[in-house]
């Protein structure tokens, strides 16, 4: 399926995609696995399995001979042992999000509105809770989160969809400094407000931050979005410093198409949304 090929596309093809299949050995496979073996171990493990299958098929068709380098790497224990890390930000499966969002829409609490917006934008909790009206350009359908609230230290532009605007536009009437005002006038909500709402909804184990992972999985598995577009949607830095210096675009319009489709999926209006395959 799409997820199978996407793993190879993102982590193997850039390094070994143009090589003759009979010239791929341990050093070439390690070039793909080593950079992500510790930080993204589960992804690296799946990548190794898929490279192994690919090379086994090539051997069965007579395109290569000898031992599979994945088997040799495993037997020689070339790569370090990785302790299973606890999942700090447990994520909801993307298939479960529309039903969860429908439930969320029935709730009037400000925390529910903030959580809906967080889920749709894939933003970090602090970015949403600190959101102020002067950061929003309704005419351009754009929210610019300033650098001082961004983990990466750079301002981030977020395209606003109809569903996102439907959440925040009614809140303008409150005339607060903050879009999602807390219990005190002109003060933001507590950073625990959305998490406590999840607990009241009896959504066990899921964290607010986890919705970023949910979006990322959906973007790869369902939308088949280019890696750069999906990563930039989460305000992740893509490429080396030199590559970023040359690629000055933040891919806003491509991200807008992706976020429109995500909003349509989450809010149950998929049929109205333009297919990203045609645009991205």
Residue positions per predicted region:
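N-terminal DNA-binding module of tyrosine recombinases/phage integrases
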Residues: 1-20, 68, 249-253, 257-279
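Basic/aromatic-enriched alpha-helical hairpins
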Residues: 1-38, 54-57, 247
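Hydrophobic (often cysteine-bearing) scaffold residues that line and stabilize catalytic clefts
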Residues: 4, 25, 43-50, 93, ...
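Catalytic-site neighborhood detector that most strongly recognizes the C-terminal catalytic loop/helix
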Residues: 6, 83, 144-153, 165, ...
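Short, basic/aromatic-rich helical patch in the C-terminal catalytic core of site-specific tyrosine
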Residues: 29, 51, 122, 128, ...
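Basic, Lys/Arg- and aromatic-enriched nucleic-acid-binding interface segment
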Residues: 36-52, 60-131, 139, 150-154, ...
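Active-site/catalytic core of tyrosine-dependent DNA strand-transfer enzymes
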Residues: 40, 91-98, 140, 149, ...
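Short, polar N-cap/turn motifs at the start of nucleic acid-interacting alpha helices
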Residues: 67, 135-142, 205, 224-245, ...
């Amino acid at each position: 399926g799409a997820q199978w090929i996407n793993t190879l596309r993102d982590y193997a093809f850039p390094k070994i995609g143009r090589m003759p299949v009979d010239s791929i050995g341990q050093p070439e496979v390690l070039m793909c696995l080593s950079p992500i073996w510790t930080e993204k171990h589960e992804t690296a493990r799946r990548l190794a399995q898929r490279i192994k299958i690919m090379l086994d098929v090539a051997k069965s068709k007579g395109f290569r001979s000898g031992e599979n380098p994945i088997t040799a790497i495993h037997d020689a224990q070339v790569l370090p042992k990785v302790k299973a890390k606890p999942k700090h930000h447990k994520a909801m499966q993307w298939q479960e999000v529309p039903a969860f969002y429908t439930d969320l829409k029935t709730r009037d609490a400000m925390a529910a509105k903030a959580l809906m917006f967080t889920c749709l934008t894939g933003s970090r909790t602090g970015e949403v809770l600190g959101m102020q009206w002067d950061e929003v350009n309704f005419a351009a359908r754009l929210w610019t989160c300033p650098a001082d609230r961004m983990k990466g230290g750079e301002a981030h532009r977020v395209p606003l969809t109809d569903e996102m605007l439907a959440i925040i536009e009614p809140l303008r009437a409150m005339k607060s400094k903050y879009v999602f005002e807390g219990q005190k006038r002109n003060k933001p909500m507590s950073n625990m407000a959305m998490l406590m709402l999840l607990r009241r909804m009896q959504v066990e184990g899921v964290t607010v931050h986890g919705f970023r992972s949910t979006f990322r999985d959906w973007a790869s598995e369902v939308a088949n979005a280019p890696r750069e577009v999906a990563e930039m949607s989460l305000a992740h830095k893509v490429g080396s410093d030199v590559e970023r210096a040359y690629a000055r675009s933040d891919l806003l319009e491509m991200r807008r198409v992706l976020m429109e489709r995500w909003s349509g999926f989450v809010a149950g209006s998929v049929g109205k949304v333009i297919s990203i395959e045609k645009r991205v």
